[in-house]
């Protein structure tokens, strides 16, 4: 199942990126939402178990909604997508909190990275400073808790998700361009597939 899921997501993501490069909006949306639906399907096929599994599934479903909203370049859609992904990270964090053994040292390290990212973004954020800071706080907490879970797929998935969001931020606030999505989206879908595999 893993190989099939990876192949399906890779194919749909390739369609999305190809369409994005050519301005084919309908195909771009279909490829991205198809790839996003696939990671939810993987979780359901695995069989969702316990508070951890249901929390992860909630995060995955919210992520699909966020992906749909972020297909638009409008500021309102970006804010709505940011809010939806914030809720997804809350769901992940709550799921991980029940099984994590968090480390204060890891908390300091992750917080230091996030502060460096915010310093990099700060001059470019303008009116988006408050929502971006709030989002960064939540994803930092999510990553910290994930790194305290004794499940390699959860640790790797959370770290890749965090890394992919750096590319989203670069695309939105620093240097927009397809290159951000060519690098960032594979990281994002790898992250979500890893988390989907952790539902049981």
Language-model features, listed with the residues they occupy:
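Polytopic alpha-helical membrane-helix bundles and their juxtamembrane interface segments
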Residues: 1-200
């Amino acid at each position: 199942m893993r190989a099939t899921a990876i192949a399906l997501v890779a194919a749909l993501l390739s369609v999305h990126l190809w369409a994005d490069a050519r301005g084919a909006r309908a195909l771009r949306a279909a490829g991205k939402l198809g790839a996003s639906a696939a990671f939810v399907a993987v979780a359901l096929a695995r069989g969702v178990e316990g508070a951890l599994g249901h929390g992860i599934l909630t995060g995955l479903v919210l992520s699909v909604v966020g992906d749909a909203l972020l297909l638009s370049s409008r500021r309102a859609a970006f804010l709505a997508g940011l809010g939806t992904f914030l809720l997804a990270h809350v769901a992940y964090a709550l799921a991980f909190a029940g099984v994590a053994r968090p480390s204060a040292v890891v908390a300091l390290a992750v917080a230091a990275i996030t502060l460096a990212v915010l310093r990099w973004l700060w001059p470019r954020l303008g009116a988006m400073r408050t929502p971006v800071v709030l989002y960064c706080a939540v994803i930092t907490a999510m990553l910290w808790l994930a790194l305290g879970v004794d499940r390699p797929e959860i640790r790797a998935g959370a770290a890749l998700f965090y890394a992919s969001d750096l590319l989203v931020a670069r695309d939105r606030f620093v240097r927009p361009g397809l290159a951000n999505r060519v690098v960032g989206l594979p990281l994002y879908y790898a992250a979500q597939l890893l988390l989907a595999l952790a539902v049981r």
